């Protein structure tokens, strides 16, 4: 039985109360009065037992060797928190459960999960796709021939002669205004041109030469000469027949 601090004090005077038997005889207490109120002699600081059994831990004084002021001590009575994560309360003889182990630290050689893959582009940049080249975007050259081309003949572009090629062609035109087939092939191989290009250049150069020298067109001159000759041939027989008809008329009159 816990003694009250007031009773320990020598100056405290114990009050005089009648014994419990007088209360029972007088009918003040019921059947359970003596048993129910029998513990009235307990001290004033008496506290009822908690709902859960109190663990038997030795209380350590607040000193240098004990835990600091920040460490939490188990509370008494109703406010006792559960000992484990699953609501398990430690019994007086059961040891305190160990705290959960921390997660393992990542290895220094292994890359972290948050680091992005260097092969993958960042989300903000768009993927570069190859440019699409359509047929109409391709330039058609004269010297390049596509063997797989099955469409119509492409439009020929104008040939740009170099200064060396023009000089050699002018020298050849100065000596010969008309080329033979053999000489045309030789010049084409020498100047890295085709026979058709040599032929067209000489045709244009001859037309320019005739224009510079103001020579008449040979085709027009030949046609005019042929027409005049045909007219003269048709007029001559008629003139020859007229005197013969006149002589024949005079002969008839004389008779």
UniProtKB/Swiss-Prot annotation:
Q: Compositional bias (Basic and acidic residues) at which positions?
A: 245-255
Q: Which CDD domains match?
A: homeodomain
Q: Which UniProt keywords apply?
A: Developmental protein, DNA-binding, Homeobox, Nucleus, Transcription, Transcription regulation
Name the SUPFAM superfamilies on file: Homeodomain-like
* GO CC term, one of those recorded: nucleoplasm
Q: Where is this motif: Antp-type hexapeptide?
A: 133-138
Q: Where does this protein have compositionally biased stretches of type Pro residues?
A: 94-109
Ranges of the DNA-binding region feature: 154-213
Renumbered to this chain, region (Disordered) spans: 31-128, 212-255
User: A single GO BP annotation from the record?
Assistant: positive regulation of transcription by RNA polymerase II
InterPro entries per record? Antp_homeobox_Deformed_sf, HD, HD_metazoa, Homeobox_antennapedia, Homeobox_Antennapedia_CS, Homeobox_CS, Homeodomain-like_sf
Residue spans with biased composition (Low complexity)?
222-234
Q: Which SMART domains match?
A: HOX (SM00389)
- Which positions carry the signal peptide feature in this UniProt record? none
**Pfam families, alphabetized:** Homeodomain
- Record keyword DNA-binding present: yes
One of the record's GO molecular function terms: DNA-binding transcription activator activity, RNA polymerase II-specific
Q: How does it assemble?
A: Forms a DNA-binding heterodimer with transcription factor PBX1.
The record describes the protein's role as: Sequence-specific transcription factor which is part of a developmental regulatory system that provides cells with specific positional identities on the anterior-posterior axis.
**Could you tell me which PANTHER family the record lists for this protein?**
HOMEOBOX PROTEIN HOX-D4, HOMEOTIC PROTEIN DEFORMED
- Give the record's family classification: Belongs to the Antp homeobox family. Deformed subfamily.
Q: What is this protein called?
A: Homeobox protein Hox-D4
Instruction: State the organism of origin.
Output: Gorilla gorilla gorilla
Q: What is the lineage of its organism?
A: Eukaryota, Metazoa, Chordata, Craniata, Vertebrata
């Amino acid at each position: 039985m816990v003694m009250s601090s007031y009773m320990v004090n020598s100056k405290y005077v114990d009050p005089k109360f009648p014994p419990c038997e007088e209360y029972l005889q007088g009918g003040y207490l019921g059947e359970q009065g003596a048993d129910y109120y029998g513990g009235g002699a307990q001290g004033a600081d008496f506290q009822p037992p908690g709902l859960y059994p109190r663990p038997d831990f030795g209380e350590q004084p607040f000193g240098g060797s004990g835990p600091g002021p920040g460490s939490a001590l188990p509370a008494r009575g109703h406010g006792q928190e559960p000992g484990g994560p699953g609501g398990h309360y430690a019994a007086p003889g059961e040891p305190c459960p160990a705290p959960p182990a921390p997660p393992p630290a990542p290895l220094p050689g292994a890359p972290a999960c948050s680091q992005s893959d260097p092969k993958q582009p960042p989300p903000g940049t768009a993927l570069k796709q190859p440019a699409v080249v359509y047929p109409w975007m391709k330039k058609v050259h004269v010297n390049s021939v596509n063997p797989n081309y099955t469409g119509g003949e492409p439009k020929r572009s104008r040939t740009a002669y170099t200064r060396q090629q023009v000089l050699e062609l002018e020298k050849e035109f100065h000596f010969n205004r008309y080329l033979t087939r053999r000489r045309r092939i030789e010049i084409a191989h020498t100047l890295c041109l085709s026979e058709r290009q040599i032929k067209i250049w000489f045709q244009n150069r001859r037309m320019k030469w005739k224009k510079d020298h103001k020579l008449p067109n040979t085709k027009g001159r030949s046609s005019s000469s042929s027409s005049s000759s045909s007219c003269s041939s048709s007029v001559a027989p008629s003139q020859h027949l007229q005197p013969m008809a006149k002589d024949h008329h005079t002969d008839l009159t004389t008779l």
